[in-house]
């Protein structure tokens, strides 16, 4: 699910998105360095097997080709970490699930990762904090 902070509008009273960090500039540098030959495919195609599994089974396919292999479409996977959640976080698969987490947990951080299931490219796309004021 390509989660954005706007998806939480109406998640319940007291839900507040504290800000967003976009990692596009860092991504562009990595892709540029790969294309210049300064980074190898092994350097940039290193997705953990669990991230690949999540991308294939619950990730949202985008219209964007993988910037490394240029053969597959990039998939988006969202993870949430915070109080009252498992240490490994929760892979969020719907806006409704995210809204429920936002209502019940005190403070959360959501990480949105782009993944290529073919070549294992992965990069953090954005992150944002969510707080629940009672």
Spans of model-derived segments:
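Short Cys/His-rich Zn2+-coordinating modules
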Residues: 41-56, 94-102
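Helix-rich interaction surfaces within compact, conserved domain-sized segments
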Residues: 110-116
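Short, flexible, mixed-charge glycine/proline-rich loop motifs
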Residues: 50-63, 76, 104-110
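N-terminal alpha-helical interaction blocks
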Residues: 1-49
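Short cysteine/histidine-rich metal-coordination sites, predominantly Zn2+-binding motifs
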Residues: 80-91, 131-134
């Amino acid at each position: 699910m390509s989660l954005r902070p706007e998806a939480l509008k109406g998640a319940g009273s007291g839900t507040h998105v504290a800000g967003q960090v976009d990692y596009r500039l860092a991504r562009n540098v990595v892709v540029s360095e790969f294309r210049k030959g300064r980074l190898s495919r092994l350097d940039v195609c290193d997705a953990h097997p669990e991230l690949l599994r999540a991308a294939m089974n619950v990730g949202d396919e985008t219209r964007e080709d993988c910037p490394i292999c240029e053969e597959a479409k990039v998939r988006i996977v969202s993870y949430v970490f915070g109080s009252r959640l498992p240490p490994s976080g929760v892979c969020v698969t719907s806006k409704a699930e995210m809204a429920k987490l936002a209502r019940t947990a005190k403070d959360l951080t959501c990480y949105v990762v782009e993944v290529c299931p073919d070549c294992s490219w992965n990069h953090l796309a954005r992150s944002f904090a969510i707080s629940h004021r009672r």
